[in-house]
């Protein structure tokens, strides 16, 4: 995180040279370069994100450090609020149903499991239900 903040002002070429010169590990180099190249592309999507699930989909693939940097880079109070909501609330939301529950409902195990569980998570983030019973009702409704 500190490294990304310190090197944030460099252009991409300068950044790569600096990282190479100081012999940082590939993992750190990749994180810093990813921040420099990917985060600016995410900001417009995040600005237009209206629902908690949309905000989650945008920020979830990022490392914690990158999300914090998005917060630091955010210009508007609305964007800062979205990132804070993700860090404080959305990133901690979990669903109650698991694969075994899906099997119990007669759903055949496979790639569809992950899709169904993601759909449940997104619906939970958007406040469509709050408990296990709500998840079951919602699942029966969408299947």
Predicted feature locations:
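C-terminal subdomains that position terminal phosphate/3'-OH groups for nucleotidyl transfer/ligation
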Residues: 1-143
